[in-house]
Design a protein with these regions (language model features):
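N-terminal small/polar loop signature for handling phosphorylated ligands or for N-terminal nucleophile
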Residues: 1, 18, 154, 158
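Small/polar loops that bind or transfer phosphate-bearing groups
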Residues: 7, 32, 171
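A cross-family phosphate/adenosyl-ligand binding-site feature
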Residues: 5, 30, 75, 94
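Short beta-strand scaffold segments in enzyme catalytic cores
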Residues: 16, 30-32, 38-42
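Conserved phosphate-binding catalytic cores of ATP/NTP-utilizing and phosphoryl-transfer enzymes
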Residues: 3, 8-29
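A contiguous, well-structured pocket-lining segment that forms one wall/lid of small-molecule binding clefts
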Residues: 82-167, 173-177
């Protein structure tokens, strides 16, 4: 039998699901964080997006997966880093925030992940592993908070006459606190 297939872009599904499920009106700012993609998008309508930032190396989800692997926390990385972070102290390790002060909304997480790998070689206990997981997650949060503030400014500059009513976070890593 002949079957009818519809091509649906996975990322477009993430981008549009908030407007479908929650009756969110356009335009809105979207942070898409998944294993393969980390992007700031201004969503102006169906099939009408402008990417204003992306990761220049590892996607956020990829960094979580690799950190979970380095710390032997199991897969999938996002939920496990989250779970073990709750057992740790989030400011026990000072970790780098690459390109945090560079203009624009691009993200870089490779240097952060490399530092986690370097520090993981000297861990003496599970407690220290959980502390490093918590510090990693907290550092990612700080990076995303700073870059989101930049993205919000860019949104306001671009969409004049409309206030930023909605900031949406979508993708697998959106579940992390």
């Amino acid at each position: 039998g002949n079957k009818l297939f519809f091509a649906i872009n996975h990322l477009e599904g993430h981008a549009l699901s908030p407007s479908i499920e929650n009756k969110i009106s356009f335009p809105y700012l979207l942070l898409l964080v998944s294993g393969g993609h980390s992007q700031y998008l201004i969503v102006k309508g169906v099939n009408n997006y402008k990417q204003i930032g992306t990761t220049i190396d590892d996607a956020v989800g990829e960094a979580f997966d690799k950190t979970a692997k380095i710390l032997n926390l199991g897969y999938p990385g996002g939920p496990n880093v989250e779970k073990f972070s709750k057992l740790g102290i989030k400011d026990s390790f000072i970790l780098p925030q690459p390109i945090i002060n560079r203009a624009g909304c691009n993200l870089s997480l490779a240097g952060l992940k490399t530092d986690v790998l370097r520090k993981s070689k000297n861990l003496k206990s599970n407690k220290e592993r959980y502390n490093l997981a918590a510090s990693f997650q907290e550092t990612v949060n700080k990076i995303l908070k700073k870059k989101t503030e930049v993205a919000m400014k860019q949104f306001r500059n671009e969409i004049t006459g409309k206030s930023l009513k909605y900031f949406v976070v979508a993708g697998g890593v959106a579940a992390n606190e």
